[in-house]
UniProtKB/Swiss-Prot annotation:
Sites of N-myristoyl glycine lipidation: G2
Renumbered residue ranges of the record's region G1 motif: 35-48
Encoding gene per record: GPA1
Protein name: Guanine nucleotide-binding protein alpha-1 subunit
Gene source species: Mycosarcoma maydis (Corn smut fungus)
Keywords tagged on the record: GTP-binding, Hydrolase, Lipoprotein, Magnesium, Metal-binding, Myristate, Nucleotide-binding, Palmitate, Transducer
Region feature G3 motif, mapped onto this chain: 196-205
Similarity section: Belongs to the G-alpha family.
Function recorded in the entry: Guanine nucleotide-binding proteins (G proteins) are involved as modulators or transducers in various transmembrane signaling systems.
Cellular compartments per GO CC: cytoplasm; heterotrimeric G-protein complex
Length: 353
């Protein structure tokens, strides 16, 4: 009897030890699992950041993946030229070269969605000729007055390469492609010992009510702002300045009861376009209290202060980074800095800092 009881006790202890070991392993895994929300207004660059995470952590795109982006890239390019041509009519800007009129008709007669693995040479030649037209260039110079994708110039400049029968999109081609995000997407990647789950939600106003599902147990928020859009209007409401919308959204997220102590990492994105735009579109025209002229340092400091000053909580830290989401090496450096921030946040939450 005694020996039998002893055997049962040993088996029970072994099971308990196994359960304890598994619980310890689960706690350790949970500690190393980081949930982050990727937030920001529409077209701020969130999807591009997610593509960069794939490039940085999983390597370059496969040939099959590149092939799958061709229709998106072709459609983005054609849609952008259609937007330009429509804007020319609305703004009463004529083509400088009348012989380009039939080429404009070719583009306007196309479906907005190109369902082909090869860009027709006639379409590519039409876009190439139109992009060289002084009237089209004049309209492009007024792109803040209508809704044009940031990638338009890049794709127009690359149109002959894209029309080659052997064309396969480069990483940069893929990074600049645009598909509206709807619903919630989840991206997994690892930096050092930490396993990240990064949730991207639709940035357009109609998508925001869906964010609530991502809120629980979030370690930190990455909030993206396209600082180059200080002179542009919303896609959904052309009476609202995009930067003002971003400020309003940041205020609501930063001071939400869901995020009282949640650290926010602010990515001030599209600095390349911002630098190009400052000398030709005075920021003071849109923010009357700005007095720094076209100086990049003054303008960027002003925008940082506008966002950071909205924070009403002493318990919350806001970390800022200036980014160009299409620059892989820069995003790799910034994400390394983000990882350091997350480690500090983890240590703080565990009472070790």
């Amino acid at each position: 009897m005694g020996c039998g009881a002893s055997k049962v006790d040993k088996e029970g202890q072994a099971r308990n030890d196994a359960i304890d070991a598994q619980l310890k392993k689960d706690r350790l895994a949970q500690k190393n699992e980081i949930k982050m929300l990727l937030l920001g207004a529409g077209e701020s660059g969130k999807s591009t950041i997610l593509k960069q995470m794939k490039l940085i952590n999983h390597g370059s795109y496969s040939a099959e993946e590149r092939e799958s982006y061709k229709e998106i890239i072709f459609s983005n390019t054609v849609q952008s030229m259609r937007v330009l041509l429509d804007a020319m009519e609305r703004l009463d800007i004529p083509l400088a070269d009348a012989t380009n009129a039939p080429r404009a008709e070719i583009i306007l007669g196309l479906s907005p969605s190109i369902e082909s693995s090869v860009l027709p040479r006639q379409v590519a030649d039409a876009i190439h000729a139109l992009w060289g037209d002084a009237g089209v260039q004049a309209c492009f110079g007024r792109s803040r007055e209508y809704q044009l994708n940031d990638s338009a110039k890049y794709y127009f400049d690359s149109i002959q390469r894209m029309a080659e029968p052997s064309y396969l999109p480069t990483d940069q081609d893929v990074l600049r492609s645009r598909v509206k995000t709807t619903g919630i997407t989840e991206t997994h990647f690892k930096i050092g010992e930490l396993n990240y789950k990064l949730f991207d939600v639709g940035g357009q106003r109609s998508e925001r009510k869906k964010w609530i599902h991502c809120f629980e147990n979030v370690t930190a928020i990455i909030f993206l702002v396209a600082i180059s859009e200080y002179d542009q209007l919303l896609y959904e409401d052309e009476n609202v300045n995009r930067m003002q919308e971003a400020l309003t959204l940041f205020d609501s997220i930063c001071n939400s009861r869901w995020f009282v102590k949640t650290s926010i990492i602010l990515f001030l994105n599209k600095i390349d376009l911002f630098k190009q735009k400052l000398p030709i579109s005075p920021m003071a025209d849109y923010f009357s209290d700005y007095t720094g002229g076209a100086d990049y340092n003054s303008a960027s400091e002003y925008i940082v202060n506008r966002f950071v000053s909205l924070n009403q909580s002493d318990a919350k830290t806001i970390y800022t980074h200036f980014t160009c989401a299409t620059d892989t090496s820069q995003i790799k450096f910034v994400m390394s800095a983000v990882n350091d921030i997350i480690i500090q946040v983890n240590l703080r939450d565990c009472g070790l800092l």
